[in-house]
């Protein structure tokens, strides 16, 4: 049954970028406004030029649920530094946020030594 008050979710991210020190935890804040209520939330990140789903089965990530749509990333490393997008779906459709960039500050430096000997 159609209702003029039914739309895909409106998904917003609090900031256009976040910064975290290497090894620390960061939460990318996502809010969802939805009528009818949203039934799922998921995140994607840019990896190799493609949007890929964030692997929520990994203990590195938490959140990304209907009740807690924000994404928390633990033990951040250089692989986490990229763009992220939050998505939410209801029976009408899927909405997505604008992208946010996570900057991981510091981290491991790979040193290579070359010898002419």
Regions found by a protein language model. Give the residues of each.
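Extracellular/luminal immunoglobulin-like beta-sandwich modules
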Residues: 1-6, 85-108
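Proline-centered linker/hinge motifs at extracellular inter-domain junctions
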Residues: 6-11, 15-16, 36, 106-109
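Short beta-strand segments of immunoglobulin-like
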Residues: 15-21, 32, 115
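Extracellular beta-strand/loop-rich beta-sandwich domains predominantly from IgSF
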Residues: 17-18, 58-92
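Extracellular Ig-like/FN3 beta-sandwich strand-entry sites
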Residues: 25, 38, 79-83
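Core motif of extracellular immunoglobulin-like domains
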Residues: 30, 43-45, 86
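Surface-exposed loop/turn motifs at beta-strand-loop junctions within extracellular Ig-like
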Residues: 34, 47, 88-92
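Solvent-exposed loop segments of extracellular immunoglobulin-like
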Residues: 35-44
